[in-house]
A protein has these predicted regions:
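Short, low-complexity N-terminal intrinsically disordered segments enriched in polar/charged residues
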Residues: 2-36, 48
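Exposed acidic/polar residues on beta-strands and adjacent loops within beta-sheet cores, strongest
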Residues: 26-29, 44, 89-96, 134-135
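Solvent-exposed, acidic/flexible segments
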Residues: 27, 39, 63-67
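Stable alpha-helical elements in mature extracytoplasmic
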Residues: 30, 34, 42, 69-74
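Short, well-ordered alpha-helical segments enriched in acidic and aromatic residues
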Residues: 42-53
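A short gly/proline-enriched turn/hairpin at secondary-structure junctions
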Residues: 56-63
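Surface-exposed, charged secondary-structure patches
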Residues: 72-110
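Short beta-strand edge/turn micro-motifs at domain boundaries
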Residues: 110-135
């Protein structure tokens, strides 16, 4: 009887550890497609992740914009600054909000990109997107 209890405890601990590591590794999967679209300079695909209204700032210009306006702003930026690479350098977050910082090399310059994503059970939406020139 004592050995059955031990086995049960070990199995429960393994299940908890496995589910915890899965949750940890899955936390930032949302940034994989977002990163891909930034690297490609694909404002159309990236805008599919935008909330209906979001805060977008590109090179110190911007503010609260509709999804359509934000797409046009990024389209303009990507047409003048062709992306060469993008790498997420930092991620953080809570249960329903994820945050990422990344370095974008575009048009021969380096930019810091900040992304806030609201996460719910049925969808993930970018609520804030910012591109700043690195001095």
């Amino acid at each position: 009887m004592h050995s059955i209890a031990r086995i049960l405890v070990v199995v429960l601990l393994m299940c908890c550890a496995a589910s915890g590591s899965k949750a940890q590794s899955g936390n930032y999967d949302v940034f994989v497609p977002i990163s891909k679209y930034i690297t490609q300079g694909n404002a159309d695909a990236l805008s599919a992740w935008f909330s209906d209204n979001l805060d977008i700032t590109v090179l110190s210009k911007g503010g609260n914009s509709s999804k359509v306006q934000a797409k046009q702003i990024l389209h303009s930026f990507f047409s003048m600054h062709t992306p060469r690479s993008f790498e997420i350098t930092y991620t953080a977050g809570r249960a329903n909000m994820k945050y990422a910082l990344g370095n974008l090399n575009a048009g021969g310059e380096t930019y810091l990109v900040t992304i806030f994503v609201y996460c719910s059970d049925d969808k993930n939406q970018i609520q804030q997107f910012k591109i700043e020139r690195v001095q």
